[in-house]
């Protein structure tokens, strides 16, 4: 007799190395808790519908719980010859409780079983990711709240642009993460759907109650089409996309952390707890955690591309190709959860070198736009003002000083309307004070932005 659940039709058994290639138990045992949760709901419903006896259902449920307990105590060894988590659990269940265990699969296929597992798993992981994003956002708000008056240079093309508040800069990542959080939240509507009861693809002749299992498993809704229920992997692609985009945002933030921590910038100092050294250069303190996060975005994006390619040519309904949906998702989930935790700790423990930042904006030309705006207040067209300031900057570069160092007489050679108040006008802190448009870097606008962010976090 074959040890395969499907072995009755076959005359020759696969060799061990073929079993190993076909099996998914090495990675889909990640789904053991979801598989048992789904099976308990299915067994409960079968008994309530009179399809199996209450006694058999109770035996099945107790057997499943004992398997779950023993697995987490490392007391169960699963077999590749049994292919996957579903058949390994069923085999162990029958071994423990006898023929009653063979009734569990009544009215169910591995097709809807694995889909149920994956929906339950993805829902839980997305909820965890949302919580981790919110936690990181909270740390960002705390840092920003303490640095509203800290001034730093902003950049375009990695060239100094304009002075801005450090709080305003770091809050940019709050809003990126807010959109990420919203995408994950919205995706739950498409994840939180029950496929159980679709069976292989066409439903079942048994009088099952899919609404009951939907309630037992706390799903928000159920699939209206059994074929769609076992064919759908959109929610996995969507989750991989949302993970990848969030990782892109973390990667951008990590790149800035790396730059800020260089000797050339010295804007921040990373904690030793989130840095490493060199095996040959004793002086080194490397931002390895930030670099790893920056690098891991390629990994999660690769999983997204892989899943898109897996599905692109699949006919309905289930195909073995779909086994490839798991490892990429599991790894992407592990990657983003780890990255979010590391990022939170890394920025929570970093030191912001406020004096260095405040001094930096006095040693560049990031206040050049302010000089042009000053000339505009003297009724000079902006394009003309731009030309005048460009010439002043060029002269400063040639003579080795900055706009705050230019003598008033020199300014007036370029335009007679420039008065002594120009020096106060060009001070970085005053540059920020004049930025009062909604969402700008001015202190009052940043404080307003922080109030909105705190309100969002409290919801």
Curated annotation (Swiss-Prot):
Xref: HAMAP family: Arg_succ_lyase (MF_00006)
Enzyme Commission code: 4.3.2.1
Gene3D superfamilies: Fumarase/aspartase (C-terminal domain) (1.10.40.30), Fumarase/aspartase (Central domain) (1.20.200.10), Fumarase/aspartase (N-terminal domain) (1.10.275.10)
Leader peptide range in chain numbering: none
Subcellular location per the Swiss-Prot or TrEMBL entry: Cytoplasm
Listed GO CC annotations: cytosol
Name of the molecule in the record: Argininosuccinate lyase
Chief location bin: cytoplasm
Keyword tRNA processing listed: no
Keywords: Amino-acid biosynthesis, Arginine biosynthesis, Cytoplasm, Lyase
Gene name, Swiss-Prot/TrEMBL: argH
CDD domains in the cross-refs: Argininosuccinate_lyase
Pathway: Amino-acid biosynthesis; L-arginine biosynthesis; L-arginine from L-ornithine and carbamoyl phosphate: step 3/3
Family designation: Belongs to the lyase 1 family. Argininosuccinate lyase subfamily.
RNA-binding listed as a keyword: no
Highest taxon in the source lineage: Bacteria
Species, as recorded: Staphylococcus aureus (strain USA300 / TCH1516)
């Amino acid at each position: 007799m074959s040890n395969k659940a499907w072995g009755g039709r076959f005359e020759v058994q696969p060799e061990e190395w073929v079993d190993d290639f076909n099996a998914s138990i090495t990675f889909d045992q990640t789904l053991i808790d979801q598989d048992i949760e789904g099976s308990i709901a299915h067994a409960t419903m079968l008994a309530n519908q009179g399809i199996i006896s209450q006694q058999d259902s109770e035996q099945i449920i107790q057997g499943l719980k004992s398997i779950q307990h023993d697995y987490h105590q490392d007391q169960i060894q699963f077999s590749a010859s049994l292919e996957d988590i579903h058949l390994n659990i069923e085999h162990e269940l029958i071994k423990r409780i006898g023929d009653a265990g063979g009734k569990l699969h009544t009215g169910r296929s591995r097709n809807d079983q694995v889909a149920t597992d994956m929906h339950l798993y993805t829902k839980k992981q997305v909820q965890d990711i949302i919580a981790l994003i919110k936690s990181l956002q909270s740390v960002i708000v705390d840092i920003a709240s303490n640095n509203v008056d800290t001034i730093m240079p902003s950049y375009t093309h990695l060239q100094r642009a304009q002075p801005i508040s450090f709080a305003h800069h770091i809050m940019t990542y709050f809003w990126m993460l807010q959109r990420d959080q919203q995408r994950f939240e919205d995706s739950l509507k498409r994840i939180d759907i029950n496929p159980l009861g679709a069976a292989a693809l066409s439903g079942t002749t048994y009088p099952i109650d899919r609404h009951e299992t939907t309630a037992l498993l706390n799903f928000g809704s159920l699939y209206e089409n059994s074929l769609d229920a076992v064919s759908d992997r959109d929610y996995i692609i969507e989750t991989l996309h949302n993970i990848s985009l969030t990782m892109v945002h973390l990667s951008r933030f990590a790149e800035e952390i790396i730059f800020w921590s260089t000797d050339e910038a010295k804007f921040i100092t990373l904690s030793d707890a989130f840095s490493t050294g060199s095996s040959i250069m004793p002086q080194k303190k490397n931002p390895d955690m930030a670099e790893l996060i920056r690098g891991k975005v390629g990994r999660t994006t690769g999983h997204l591309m892989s899943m898109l390619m897996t599905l692109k040519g699949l006919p309905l309904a289930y195909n073995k190709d779909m086994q490839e949906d798991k490892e990429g998702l599991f790894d992407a989930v592990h990657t983003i959860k780890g990255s979010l935790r590391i990022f939170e700790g890394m920025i929570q423990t970093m030191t912001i070198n406020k004096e260095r930042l405040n001094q930096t904006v006095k040693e560049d030309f990031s206040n050049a736009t302010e000089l042009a705006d000053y000339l505009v207040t003297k009724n000079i067209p902006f394009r003309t003002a731009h030309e005048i300031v460009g010439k002043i900057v060029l002269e400063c570069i040639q003579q080795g000083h900055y706009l705050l160092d230019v003598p008033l007489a020199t300014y007036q050679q370029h335009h007679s309307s420039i008065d002594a108040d120009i020096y106060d006008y060009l001070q970085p802190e005053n540059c920020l004070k004049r930025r009062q448009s909604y969402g700008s870097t001015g202190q009052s606008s940043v404080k307003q932005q922080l109030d909105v962010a705190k309100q969002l976090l409290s919801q």
